[in-house]
Curated annotation (Swiss-Prot):
Gene: tpiA
Cellular component annotations (GO), alphabetically ordered: cytosol
Function: Involved in the gluconeogenesis. Catalyzes stereospecifically the conversion of dihydroxyacetone phosphate (DHAP) to D-glyceraldehyde-3-phosphate (G3P).
Highest rank taxon of the organism: Bacteria
Name of the protein in question: Triosephosphate isomerase
Length: 243
């Protein structure tokens, strides 16, 4: 049985003081969280130790927003798996569309990051998705399949999460129709050939659409951006009820 993963990606938001205030509001909202789901937050690196301390003994798990493929070395601005594990981080987001866009990350680099995470006991959340232009040209499936096949090469599908995030739906307020998101997630599952693969949807997820998304047969969780910054809104998302 696939256990859904509800994850919030804070991106470059939240100081340590803001993270403390956030978790003070959020933790009471998940006091009765059902046991049939994982709950994860990916804060900026500076707030990881703060959240690790304040979330100890709760249902909240931690993710990094990236991870390097080397254990140490002259890699300015990067972070290693061992540095993350020291703070009880369990997941690592790799391949998000923003580093793909702004830092020209390739599928090969993303695969190196994901392999490093998995080898060192972290669960990679590998992001894939097409741009608006690629979708309008009918290239969405080809682009996503390439990202999946190259990004997941050599990985154990039972120890990773794939996040389908159509780029045109990230931070735009546009949400992919639940049925279409479900169709793409089903294709990803068939390409990987693993019925137990956890596949999230990401892209303008909010309290108003979470129940419908989680009612889809091939969507096993969500990767939430802006809506995860509001503790009450993210609490509602965490406590979804399938529609």
């Amino acid at each position: 049985m696939r256990k859904p993963v509800i994850a919030g990606n804070w991106k470059m938001h939240m100081t340590c003081a803001q993270a403390r205030a956030w978790i003070g509001t959020f933790l009471p909202l998940i006091a009765e969280l059902p046991n049939d789901r994982h709950l994860v937050v990916a804060p900026p690196f500076t707030a990881i130790s703060t959240l690790a301390e304040l979330s100890e003994g709760t249902r909240l798990e931690l993710s990094s927003q990236n991870v390097h493929w080397e254990g140490e070395g002259a890699y300015t601005a990067e972070i290693s798996p061992s540095m993350l594990k020291e703070h009880n981080v369990q997941y690592a987001i790799v391949g998000h569309s923003e580093p793909r866009k702004y830092f020209s990350e390739s599928d090969e680099q993303i695969n190196h990051r994901a392999r490093s995470a998995q080898t060192n006991g972290l669960i990679p959340i590998v992001c894939v998705g097409e741009s608006d232009e690629q979708r309008s040209r009918g290239e969405a499936e080809r682009v996503i399949r390439r990202q999946v096949e190259q990004g997941l090469e050599g990985l154990d599908p039972s120890q990773l999460v794939v996040a389908y995030e159509p780029i045109w739906a990230i931070g735009t307020g546009k949400t992919c129709e639940a049925s279409e998101a479900n169709r793409i997630c089903g294709l990803i599952r068939s390409w990987v050939g693993s019925p137990d693969l956890i596949i999230q949807y990401g892209g303008s997820v909010k309290p108003g659409n979470i129940d419908q998304l989680m009612g889809m047969s091939d969507i096993d969780g969500v990767l939430v951006g802006g809506a995860s910054l509001d503790p009450e809104g993210f609490g509602r998302i965490a406590n979804y009820v399938k529609s």
